Amino acid sequence: PGYYNKNACKKIEEICLTFPEKEGMVQDTKTGKINDTINKVRRSKVRFINLQDGDFLGSHELYTELTNLIAKINKDFFHFDIKGLDSIQYTEYDGSYKGHYDWHTDWNWSNPMNPPRKLSMTIQLTDGSEYEGGDFEIAHDIEPGYEPTKQLGTVIVFPSFMPHKVAPVTAGLRKSLVVWFTGPKFK
């Protein structure tokens, strides 16, 4: 079983669904500008959990929980200088439109964000039996078909500079929570 149980995943989803839905977008690596017309790279629906919009159903507690979780994971595995949380994004990839996100990094080296994203976290909110396709892959690490990444409640954390992707969902609906943690530039 994953780190989060079914009830915890349902609670996370309830919090996320109180925020407005948007089309997933891609940042142009040359200009740094948001490009919402790149469908071949990314097709998804997203909701950003923004504390400035208010505390809906416990979004403040969710921020606290995720911050505490990354502190433990970072201490045990990465030892990065983490100072904050960039944002929380709830993402849906639907088989009806072949939802996907092709190879990308969460850190843009040619147009660095300030502060830079250092660790990326994804939490699986849908059990793999509820959709087809949609494999989460990390270059040179997690390969297609690695079943533990599809277990409900699974948490995956990796350096934001590592290329990763979500393969097209061919049937059903894949839901996940993505969180980016920031800190000073790498030395």
Listing of model-derived features with the role each one plays in the protein:
Residues P1-F78:
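Non-heme Fe(II)/2-oxoglutarate
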Residues H60-K187:
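Catalytic core of non-heme Fe(II) oxygenases with the double-stranded beta-helix
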